[in-house]
Amino acid sequence: MTRPVFRHDRPGTSASAWTTVLAAHAMVPLQLPSVAGRLVVVGAHPDDETLGAGGLIRVAAIAGWQVEVVSATAGEGSHPRSPTHSRELLAQVRRHELDQAIARLAPGAAVTCLGLPDGAVADHLAELVAHLVAMIGIDGEDVLLLAPWRRDGHPDHEAAGLAAAIAAARTDARLVEYPVWLWHWGDEQGVPWAQVRELPLDDEVRAAKMSATAAHASQVEPLSPAPGDEVLLDAPLRAHFRRDLELFFEDDEPVRDDALDLVHRERSDPWQVESDYERHKRAVTLASLPRQRYEHGLEVGCSIGALAVDLAQRCGRLLAVDASETAVTAARERTAGLDQVEVRRAAVPAQWPSGRFDLVSISEVGYFLSPRQLAGVVERSLAALTEDGHLLLCHWRHQPVGWPLAGPAVHEAFLASGAPVLVEHQDPDFVLHVLGRPA
């Protein structure tokens, strides 16, 4: 378990000191859509969501938003030396408190506790990302995702924030982060003021937040008079969350999602390219090409270069690209003897290569894009085709864990462009299309 950078039982920055600091800064209001959507709230532990964003949860509920709350852990590690409460009992108590708190902020909201180990959320990052992606789904642009600040000073908070940032990048959800422990350990110099967003809280919203905070009794009151059962959030700490406003951070910089690069670093052949399934799929892919020879091909998402080797036999020139530097290195090694092949690192659609191609191959990569990114790839790939060019699509038809799109949805996005379908192949495990350039 990674230790926090602070001690909750040591003196910290006072609420009055922060009041002075905040008064000296003109802060940008938090802009909420005029039409109610979905609010997905992530906490590392029960009470994070109430302390950091209880006011916003209440505001959204009043406005008719669909509110969903997920706590990564049950917070069973809050009192490690308690003589009266085991970790199992604390988990049970805190789950119940979470339900009660959210009922006071957003009656009817869905509440989920994943039960990841308290203090070790970072060790379960992929699991948390996958859960959030599944919650958000394919309509991420309608979702406001709230999560702990990635620089909050507590490892569980920072891991939960990172998981939410990755999930937002994969789904196109809007990410807004809330600080909790910053108010205890931080100071004016530690705040990225350009990212700060302010939400004023009226009396009714503040009262609901205070009531929800009180519902987390195991944290705001002693468990018992015995040593080890002391109050976790004492009055000076709670004072930070009694303000008539809440502050959030909104960072426009995209998070680095290196999951696919990690897959390639951990395994030299992550997709088992010599398996019977992969060999069969490549054979069908090559047999589906309407022409024997192409002048200039582009393969998007080449991975370690297995398909690139085969496509090179059909292309005078082939440019193969992948977002993973590790994959690019492996693909260059695999195609080293093929002078007509160039392998380049590029993340599409942002780094789409220039030029026109009479063959564009997009195979087993579309579902690793967010819906917005996929729309960009559809546009760029069709625009890059020569008049007689072909767009080859081939994707596993099942749902990949941790991403919102499956193969059939990827193909539907391309088919919706109106591009003529020249070849269609439906396999139990994959779907293949060859499209022409739209008229």
Model-identified regions with their sequence ranges:
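A short acidic, Gly/Pro-enriched loop at the edge of an enzyme's catalytic core
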Residues: 353-360
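Residues lining the SAM
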Residues: 148, 363-366
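Class I (Rossmann-like) S-adenosyl-L-methionine-dependent methyltransferase catalytic domain
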Residues: 253-292, 296-353, 369-383, 390-439
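A conserved mid-domain beta-alpha-beta active-site/ligand-binding segment of alpha/beta enzyme cores
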Residues: 188, 193-219
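Short "lid" loop at the C-terminus of a central beta-strand within the Rossmann-like core
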Residues: 73-76, 181-182, 396-400
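Conserved N-terminal segment of class I S-adenosyl-L-methionine
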Residues: 2-37, 111, 235, 240-292, ...
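Active-site beta-strand->loop->alpha-helix modules in alpha/beta enzyme cores, enriched
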Residues: 2-177, 211, 227, 236, ...
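Short, flexible loop segments at boundaries between secondary-structure elements
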Residues: 172-189
